[in-house]
């Protein structure tokens, strides 16, 4: 990019933000009684030089991301034709034509190859107001059009909802191979899958550190379950703490503590320790089985599974182990609780009398339960929340093979994000991208 071009883009960004963009900004309020998806057109992106194919892929992924969010009614690009004479400056945009096809929002972009990777210049317009409201220059390393698209979609969501987007986040999961267990990550929509670890011993229960720098897993490398941490910066895989028969570790929201389970003889209790593995102490001392801790977003409470009532049920207690109370009273086999980052819901898996597994959510305060899946295969399990608490991902066999599905918090919109059969298990949604 030339110096003149960079200065022009900076001036344009100042011109459209923040004052102009703040005027009568159309805000999407999810969950409001009058919510409706916002109609938006994502025009064909312009590829500069040899970036034509990358521009096409970027636009396609942006459209798919916005559809997956459930916040937008993304108009079919076959319903409108590109106008070669239409530029990017607001005076050149034929807003009346875009209004005629039903668009309230319009996204356009230039994509080019920069010195270190792809660059995208995103432009967003409010069609009814006839103005440009956002311009953003985004860069990604290498030729990763998908990552560029996810960042663009995040910017669009941020403008309309005033909340961070979650498309640039990653999902961790365990994949079983022939005699191997792999720790893998992928984009939240199933793309860009990468293998981080391949072990000949069992791997289970991945859990992200809140800053995204490490993933905690349960490893059987020593022949017994132990907590190990994978570090992205140097790909180190190291044991954490001194407990054998420790499993299911999860970081506290501030990353300073880890709650986990220890099985000693016939006793299975919850423990907590500092993030470096020091200072471990018991949280529960009960003859029952206590497993699967999950933190409230403020770090003050922990939900977990216990069979102290005779069957596995969800309980909530203080983060110091005090005041445990039963939360679920429906069903006789409830497991894998996951506390929403918004704090209002806990997702979990329940098994019914037919041995069918489904996903539910429960209010941690009132105990009110809502069903997310029903009659959608025999297995819907292991829910994990997106960092915005509006979406979750879980494992399902509804189409004849194991898949990962993204759902909203009500279960109204459920979208497979893996194609065909997959052996992925224990999906864990990672934190917001830096």
UniProtKB/Swiss-Prot annotation:
User: What are the alphabetically sorted keywords of the record?
Assistant: Cell cycle, Cell division, Periplasm, Signal
Name recorded for this polypeptide:
Tol-Pal system protein TolB
Major subcellular location class: periplasm
Gene3D superfamilies on file: TolB, C-terminal domain, TolB, N-terminal domain
- Per UniProt, what is one Pfam family of this protein? PD40
Q: Which domain of life is it from?
A: Bacteria
- Give the function comment from the record: Part of the Tol-Pal system, which plays a role in outer membrane invagination during cell division and is important for maintaining outer membrane integrity.
Q: Where is this region: Disordered?
A: 411-434
The entry's localization annotation reads: Periplasm
- UniProt keyword annotation of Transmembrane present: no
Q: Which family does it belong to?
A: Belongs to the TolB family.
What span is annotated as the signal peptide, if there is one?
Answer: 1-21
Q: Which SUPFAM superfamilies match?
A: TolB, N-terminal domain, Tricorn protease N-terminal domain
Originating species: Anaeromyxobacter dehalogenans (strain 2CP-1 / ATCC BAA-258)
Q: Which GO terms describe its cellular component?
A: periplasmic space
Presence of the UniProt keyword Nucleotide-binding in the record: no
Q: How does it assemble?
A: The Tol-Pal system is composed of five core proteins: the inner membrane proteins TolA, TolQ and TolR, the periplasmic protein TolB and the outer membrane protein Pal. They form a network linking the inner and outer membranes and the peptidoglycan layer.
Protein's GO biological process: cell division; protein import
